[in-house]
From Swiss-Prot:
Taxon lineage: Eukaryota, Fungi, Dikarya, Ascomycota, Taphrinomycotina
Bias (Basic and acidic residues) ranges: 549-561, 577-595
Primary location class: cytoplasm
Originating organism: Schizosaccharomyces pombe (strain 972 / ATCC 24843)
Subcellular location: Cytoplasm
Protein name: GYF domain-containing protein mpd2
Gene3D superfamilies: 3.30.1490.40
Entries under InterPro entries matching the protein: GRB10-interact_GYF (IPR051640), GYF (IPR003169), GYF-like_dom_sf (IPR035445)
Gene Ontology terms: cellular component: cytoplasm; cytosol
Top-level taxon: Eukaryota
The entry's keywords: Cytoplasm, mRNA transport, Phosphoprotein, Transport
Family the UniProt entry places it in: Belongs to the SMY2/mpd2 family.
């Protein structure tokens, strides 16, 4: 019940209307001049109206009935019945007309003329009414100004709702039951929105009002298919016998082109909206749900055989409050541009809606915006006022953000060209305005179209088949057509990862699996041949034609299982911290492989045999792939370069060992078969690290046995080990030399290896001649020194290490001190010039046993070779506890002992600066003075031991030392003002 209905039902209008009616008939009444609107409201005039000259007299025979009927009619809201003005129009054809009012049946007979002859609706677009409408005349003679309804802009919809009897179509609305606002009103039925004022609400295209539209009853077609419109009669019992003739619900008004196939004589075209009256006995038989305005469409009347369902025009329920929502949805979706291309739901939604929704039987326009088929995704659309836009001006400056309303105003004003780069604030890439218009399908107001939220993939504009560049969305059909190949799109290509190493990370993703698999295949001793690799590559790339896509649906499942298995196996790979290289892991997958024959085969470091590997899971050979990738270009990696250089260097350094080793039958190497990553092609490796390590171990074993059997060589080695660890010209603080290679070879730089190996060859030749020149004191000291036992693993690359330890770098000249007169004063013997230097670039980690052995041996070397007493060394150890963490005490003390044992400025500054550089809590100057004093005192009391060490005595007392050069210089003044000349003043001199 609306508000107007409550006003009409609760107020007693009979007294007011009766008094107004009397005053309106009196020409001298002041009401006419004071309230002209009420005059025109209560006294409508027309050509044949109530107050017209032809019908101003009311029949006295019915005046008694009018008093009782007037009160009931006014109470129900039908004001025209109280004024004896029948508000309903009859047909222009008198043969079809019926009794118009139950209150006054004598006014119009079946053969008489109606009160309103030839009623039409005025063609007035300003929402006012002409005299022919018999409602409100804006140019009435009694009104001194314009009608108030016209001034206030009252819409036709408001007049129709407030005064329902003024727009009724069928007969019999004089009854208070039918004329009251509580009943349904028969109105024109079109598929247009009630809010669209410019659209015609009537199918009559003549002089009908496009705003209101009043339809007339058509002429009977003479067919027995339709019910009789004039079935009611005044003689029927019940007080209101003709009520049923017009009690039809408004939604039962159907239109069909089959109503009048041959047209009608009254000028109304075929297919016009009809008002079909149901028979008397069938009015109350309709179910309540069929009368509900929420139930829309032709499915409302599936059981009513008397109402034909037309196909030319869809039913429109103007009484339903849902029409407002539907109209808003039409405006949002831009029905004018997109009516032919609605948003297509998914296949499952279409199938479900086609089976279960009543809207499936509707016409396309009705089913598109019906309540059952309303698109659910419209609820998440963002209105234009909340959309934020950015655009780039001609100077490529970003402007914004602006709302969609502002962008629309500027677009309609012509400021935006079609090539303007625009984007939403949430999007990443710009696109042209023309592209945006094509996407929304609305050129007039593209910025007013509600848009969906921007996702991570920027798929707000992307439907299936669009070519938006900022989209990562793959259409469903493309995914289905790809079949078993769609999972391979994210995999890295073979050319990208063929020579890439990822040693420090475990296999947690597909790319890491590819990298680790490639590293394993490189470090293994198997080399997969080209044919097998091509087969595995074709199998991995989903090698099948488009016709066989659905036959290989198990291919991605198989690959996923293999990937999971590979990830589990790769997770167990242990990485060595010392060498940063992988161990070849054993895969649990069953693999059939051919192994190396046990015959005599010489393995060259430049090339190795190729072993074909056949995967057990690959039972049938796949078809050749049309997308077969090009063979990757082989680039030598770091491991290959190192292994090649090591093999060449070792073969040159030890030719005799290589020759003796070649005579022995090699042990059959067990080949560990590997299944590489299915998408990566295994590249051939020239020399594997495992083979190099095994061959080096054999060579070192032979060398060890050969050296152990030769006592002369052992003596020379001991003599070399007895020399001072560091000389005056060597670099102190270098890392200690490795004694053993733990499990993997260290990554040595190839230029350093070449240089050291070349010098090692010369050093081996000099070892034989240098044995006889060794001092007996060194042999005795070396014999008394306990030798550290080498661990069992100290066999790998021992020869190379020993050569590096005892090698002499001849390319670097020793230091020569130039004395007075340009003479070299510290010329040493050739045996003394050959000093031992440790390589500074060798990186390794010693185990606990080796560290303890090297520490004890170095301490003993310091004690034995420096000539200092243990008391002095103990004081040095206690005093140097304040060194920073990470500073090696032995190396630092060895560096201090290599300095001249003299109390001069240079030695003092070097010691103090070294203390300041390696400690934050020690006093460098105090330690330098105390260290020099104690050292000189210790050496002067040990003359016998000092004479035994020739190199140390030359270092401290040689005339060619730095102290000898500095000693000849004149002594500089130590006063603070030594640079200035002091001038005494003359006392007796007078000033002028």
């Amino acid at each position: 019940m609306n508000s107007e209905a409550s006003v009409f039902s609760n107020m007693d209008w009979s007294q007011l209307a009766h008094s107004l009616h009397k005053k309106a008939n009196n020409s001298s009444s002041s009401t006419t001049g004071a309230f002209p609107q009420l005059t025109s409201f209560t006294k409508p005039t027309a050509t044949n109206g109530v107050d017209s000259p032809t019908s101003s007299h009311i029949d006295p025979s019915v005046s008694a009935k009018l008093d009782s009927q007037r009160k009931l009619s006014l109470k129900s809201g039908n004001m025209w019945d109280s004024l004896n003005a029948p508000s309903e129009l009859t047909s222009k054809n008198p043969t079809v007309s019926s009794t118009t009012s139950s209150a006054n049946p004598a006014i119009v007979s079946n053969g008489g003329s109606p009160f309103y002859k030839n009623p039409v609706v005025a063609n007035n677009p300003s929402s006012t009414f002409d005299m022919s409408t018999n409602l409100f005349n804006s140019k009435n003679a009694n009104t001194s100004f314009t009608n108030a309804f016209s001034n206030e802009g009252i819409s036709p919809g408001f007049l129709r709702d407030c005064f329902p009897s003024s727009n009724s179509i069928t007969t019999g609305t004089a009854s208070p039951k039918l004329g009251s606002p509580f009943n349904h009103i028969n109105r024109p039925v079109l598929d247009r929105s009630p809010s669209s004022f410019s659209q015609s609400r009537s199918a009559v295209s003549g002089n009908m009002n496009p705003g209101v539209g009043t339809l007339q009853q058509p002429q009977r077609a003479g067919s027995d298919t339709f019910p009789d419109l004039n079935t009611s009669s005044s003689n029927q019992p019940g007080g209101e016998p003709n009520v049923a003739s017009a009690n039809t619900h408004s939604l039962e008004i159907l239109s069909s082109s089959a109503y009048h196939p041959s047209g009608s004589s009254n000028g109304i075209s075929a297919g016009l909206t009809q008002s079909v009256a149901s028979p008397v006995g069938q009015v109350d038989n309709l179910a309540d749900f069929s009368q509900s305005p929420l139930r829309r469409g032709p499915s409302r009347f599936p059981t009513n055989s008397n109402v034909p369902v037309g196909n030319s025009m869809s039913i429109r329920d103007t009484d339903s409050p849902l029409n407002i929502l539907v109209d808003k949805a039409k405006a949002k979706a831009s029905i004018k541009e997109n009516a032919s291309q609605p948003v297509a739901p998914s296949a499952s939604q279409r199938e479900h809606s086609a089976v279960n929704s009543p809207a499936a039987a509707m016409s396309p326009s009705t089913a598109m915006f019906s309540s059952e088929a309303f698109p659910q995704h419209l609820a998440s659309l963002i209105p234009p006022a909340l959309l934020h836009w950015l655009y780039k001006d001609p100077q490529n400056n970003v402007q914004g953000p602006f709302t969609g309303v502002d962008m629309h105003q500027w677009y309609r004003a012509g400021y935006f060209p079609l090539g303007l780069p625009i984007k939403r604030l949430e999007e990443e890439e710009y696109y042209s305005l023309a592209f945006f218009i094509r996407q929304v399908g609305n050129q007039l107001e593209p910025f007013l179209v509600p848009l969906s939220p921007v996702t991570v993939q920027n798929a707000s504009w992307n439907a299936q088949g669009t070519d938006l560049p900022l989209s990562n969305y793959l259409p469903e059909s493309s995914e289905q057509n790809r079949g078993g190949n769609k999972h391979l799109e994210l995999y890295p290509s073979t050319a990208e990862v063929s020579n890439v190493r990822n040693d420090e990370s475990k296999a947690n993703s597909l790319s890491e699996i590819s990298y680790n698999q490639q590293s394993e295949c490189r470090s293994s001793e198997l080399n997969v041949n080209e044919d097998s690799a091509n087969q595995k590559e074709e199998s991995a790339l989903g090698t099948s034609d488009n016709s066989d896509m659905y036959e290989k649906e198990n291919t991605p499942i198989h690959h996923n299982e293999s990937l999971n298995q590979l990830s589990k196996d790769l997770g167990s790979i242990s990485l060595s911290e010392e060498t940063k290289q992988e161990k070849p892991s054993k895969l649990k997958e069953t693999v059939e492989s051919k192994r190396l024959s046990t015959g005599v085969q010489k393995q060259s470091p430049a090339a190795s045999k190729e072993i074909p590997v056949t995967s057990g899971s690959q039972t049938t050979a796949p078809k050749p792939s049309p997308w077969k990738s090009l063979p990757p270009k082989h680039l030598p990696s770091l491991d290959e370069t190192i292994s090649r250089e090591m093999s060449i260097a070792s073969s040159e350094a030890l030719p005799q060992v290589e020759k003796s080793n070649s005579d022995q039958p090699p042990v059959a190497i067990p080949s560990t078969s590997k299944t590489g990553s299915p998408w990566a092609k295994v590249s051939d490796v020239s020399t594997s690290m495992a083979q190099e390590i095994q061959r080096m171990e054999k060579q070192n074993e032979n060398l060890k046995s050969k050296v152990a059997s030769n006592p002369v060589s052992q003596t020379s080695t001991n003599a070399k080990a007895s020399t001072p660890a560091l000389a005056s010209g060597s670099i102190w603080g270098s890392p200690s030399v490795i004694n053993a290679w733990a499990n993997k070879p260290a990554a040595l730089k190839s230029p350093l290896i070449k240089k050291n190996i070349q010098q090692a060859e010369l050093a081996q030749n000099k070892q034989q001649s240098s044995v006889t020149t060794a001092s007996p004191r060194s042999n005795a000291l070396n014999a008394n020194t306990p030798k550290a036992a080498a661990p069992s693993s100290n066999v790998t690359m021992k020869n190379v290490t020993s050569i590096l330890e005892t090698s002499t770098f001849e390319g670097e000249d020793t230091w020569s001190v130039v004395g007075p007169g340009g003479k070299i004063v510290n010329q040493q013997s050739p045996s003394a010039q050959q000093t031992t230097r440790s390589p500074s670039k060798v990186s390794a980690t010693l185990n606990a046993g080796n560290s303890q052995a090297s520490t004890s041996s170095k301490l003993q070397q310091v004690v034995s070779m420096s000539g200092h007493s243990p008391d002095f060394l103990a004081w040095c150890k206690i005093s140097l506890k304040g060194l920073n963490e990470g500073v090696n005490y032995e190396e630092f003390l060895d560096m201090l002992l290599s300095l001249p044992a003299e109390n001069n400025v240079e030695t003092f500054e070097i010691i103090s600066d070294s203390i300041y550089a390696n400690s934050t809590i020690m006093d460098g100057r105090r330690f330098a003075s105390e260290f020099t004093r104690r050292r000189i005192a210790d050496l002067t009391g040990k003359d016998g031991q000092q004479s035994n060490n020739k190199s140390q005595s030359e270092l401290g007392n040689s005339s060619g030392a730095w102290s000898q050069v500095v000693r000849n210089k004149p002594k500089q003044g130590t006063e603070w003002n030594s640079a200035f000349k002091v001038v005494t003043s003359k006392k007796n001199k007078k000033r002028v």
